[in-house]
């Protein structure tokens, strides 16, 4: 959700391409008009009609945040096929060059609906795994010695970090929803 390093993104894209070749070996040589054999040129998204660009941007940025929620839930063993399938539907809509407002607006609204389900799933995963959060007073002092600052919202990473540093004299600091 926050990685904008070109080299890292290229490695991820290459990994996706390799997986696609294994799952659907003939896709790249297929002459079907679906267009799934080509990479999507993102620059076309930013040069289209302003209203269409706005709707597709809402879809794109909506599923981008939703993907982070879905990932964190899946790390804790919680998935929902409806959410997974919607990513394909949303990406397909973004890639459709001839879709107008009449087809894109319902997808934008569906992003909100599916995103709500995704947040419910993440809440279920977090509360089942870690318990229901309660207001708690925490010290705001900085202790002497080595420390690690962890930020974000991946509670599993925080759990693993706490386990790895237990009884080693390393202080862990965080903020916001990690508390």
Q: Which residues fall in each region the model found?
A:
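Metallocofactor- and cofactor-centric catalytic cores in central/energy metabolism, strongly enriched
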Residues: 1-179
């Amino acid at each position: 959700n926050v990685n904008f390093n070109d080299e890292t993104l290229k490695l991820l894209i290459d990994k996706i391409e390799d997986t696609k070749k294994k799952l659907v070996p003939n896709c790249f040589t297929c002459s079907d008009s679906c267009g799934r054999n080509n990479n999507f040129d993102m620059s076309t998204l930013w040069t289209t009609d302003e209203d269409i660009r706005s709707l597709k941007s809402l879809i794109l940025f909506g599923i981008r945040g939703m993907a982070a929620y879905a990932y964190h839930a899946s790390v804790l063993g919680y998935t929902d096929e409806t959410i997974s399938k919607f990513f394909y539907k949303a990406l397909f809509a973004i890639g459709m060059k001839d879709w107008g407002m009449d087809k894109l607006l319902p997808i934008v609204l569906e992003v909100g609906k599916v995103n709500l389900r995704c947040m419910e799933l993440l809440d279920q995963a977090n509360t089942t795994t870690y318990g229901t959060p309660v207001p708690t007073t925490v010290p705001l002092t900085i202790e002497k010695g080595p420390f690690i600052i962890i930020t974000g919202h991946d509670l599993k990473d925080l759990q693993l970090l706490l386990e790895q540093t237990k009884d080693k004299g390393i202080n862990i600091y965080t903020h916001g929803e990690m508390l």
